[in-house]
Amino acid sequence: MEYAILFLPLIGALIGYVIKVFGDIYSEIVTTLFVSAAAILSIILFYNGIVYEDYGNYKIYQWIASGKFVVNASINIDPLSSIMLVVVSLVSALVHIYSIGYMSHDPDKPRFMCYLSLFTFAMFTLVVSDNFLQLFFGWEGVGLCSYLLIGFWYKKESANDAAIKAFIVNRIGDFGLAIGIFLIFFFFGSI
């Protein structure tokens, strides 16, 4: 279930992008259903955590191995990450549902819905990361998707300017986060 929660928005974004050739509505339905399914599973996961204390660390694969230094791509489920999964997934599902009507006039709806699903996947990655390197990649994914969503109407100069400003501000945060991760590795030998 933990793997499904993390990867459903990514799979929904990919399928939504591919099936847009059959019509905008299919892309909207797929991305919204996949994110909504992740929201339902997040609520179940949260319930299992509260009632059965069903928390854990779920390894996806070994990412980096160099001597004694090993970094796994893992899903860490604890009380904080489970409640954040519920918050992020419910808000994202509601935004997806609202966007179906809000973007009804736009010919690029499938692209917007795919960006939203990718944003949800990046937020999930950020929330359930087991180490600082994975957290950094989730942070970068959120920054990239923010840039893409802010600059969605790229033909408008104001949207492009706002996207570039957001991108620059995110780079400042990235720099600070990267320095912090480097210092943690330098002093503790682990991330």
Regions found by a protein language model. Give the residues of each.
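...captures the hydrophobic TM-helix bundle architecture rather than a specific catalytic motif
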Residues: 1-191
